C-alpha cells in the first residue's frame, strides 16, 4: 500500500515496484493498487483521507480473501500506506497473517495537529477547504480526520508478526514512529537502516528486499 501522493509503483525506482517483483521471484504472489484519487485510479485526490484509503483497503482484502481465496494474506505498507495497512491488520486480525511496515507515517497525526504537511502550513484550528501540498490539492477533511486518528491505539489490537523497517536518514517521517510501534507491538521486529531515506533508494535496498522476503517466507 503506497504512501501520500504516491502510487503502486510503475518502475524500479519505486520501493513497492522493486519489492513486488523481488517477492514474485521468491514465489510470493503480490497484489498492488493505486488508492482512489491517485495515479490511474478513479476519483479526485482532494477527496482522499486515511479513512477513504482504509475503505479501499477493505475492498482489496475482500478480493484477495473471497475472490482469490488466498490462504495467507500479508499486508505491506509504505509511509501513509503503512498507517493504513496497520489499521487494516487490526481490523482483520483473524485474516492478516503478517504485516510489513516501511517507514510508517504515524507522524501524520502530529503534523495535522501542528498544521503542517510536507512543508505546507495551515491553521490547524481553522482548517481550510483545501491545502496545496507541492502541487497536490489536499482536502480539508484529510486534516480534520487525521487530527483524531487512533493510530497507536489501533496498532495494539494487532498481535501478528510485524516487520518494521525505517531509514535513519528519513527526513519525511521520523524513525521514532517505527520505534514507538516496536514498543507497543510485542510481536514486532525493528530494523533501522543507516543511510536510507524515506523512499529507500539508497545502496542498501537489496538488503531491505531480502529482509522482507525472509520475514514472509519464514
List each model region and its residues.
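Alpha/beta-hydrolase active-site loop
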Residues: 47-67
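Glycine-rich "HGGG/HGxG" loop immediately N-terminal to the catalytic nucleophile
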Residues: 34-48
Amino acid at each position: 500500500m503506497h504512501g501520500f501522493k504516491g502510487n503502486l509503483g510503475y518502475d524500479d525506482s519505486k520501493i513497492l515496484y522493486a519489492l513486488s517483483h523481488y517477492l514474485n521471484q521468491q514465489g510470493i504472489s503480490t497484489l498492488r493498487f493505486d488508492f482512489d484519487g491517485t495515479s490511474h485510479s478513479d476519483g479526485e485526490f482532494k477527496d482522499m483521507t486515511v479513512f477513504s484509503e482504509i475503505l479501499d483497503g477493505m475492498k482489496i482484502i475482500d478480493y484477495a480473501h473471497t475472490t482469490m481465496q488466498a490462504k495467507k494474506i500479508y499486508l505491506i505498507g509504505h509511509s501513509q500506506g503503512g498507517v493504513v495497512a496497520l489499521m487494516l491488520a487490526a481490523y482483520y486480525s483473524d485474516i492478516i497473517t503478517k504485516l510489513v511496515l516501511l517507514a510508517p507515517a504515524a507522524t501524520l497525526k502530529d503534523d495535522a495537529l501542528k498544521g503542517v504537511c510536507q512543508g505546507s502550513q495551515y491553521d490547524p484550528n481553522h482548517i481550510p477547504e483545501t491545502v496545496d501540498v507541492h502541487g497536490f490539492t489536499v482536502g480539508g477533511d484529510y486534516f480534520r480526520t487525521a487530527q483524531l486518528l487512533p493510530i497507536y491505539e489501533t496498532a495494539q489490537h494487532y498481535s501478528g508478526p510485524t516487520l518494521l523497517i525505517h531509514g535513519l536518514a528519513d527526513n519525511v517521517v521520523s524513525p521514532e514512529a517505527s520505534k514507538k510501534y516496536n514498543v507497543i507491538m510485542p510481536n514486532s521486529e525493528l530494523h533501522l537502516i543507516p543511510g536510507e531515506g524515506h523512499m529507500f533508494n539508497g545502496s542498501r535496498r537489496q538488503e531491505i528486499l531480502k529482509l522482507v522476503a525472509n520475514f514472509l517466507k519464514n
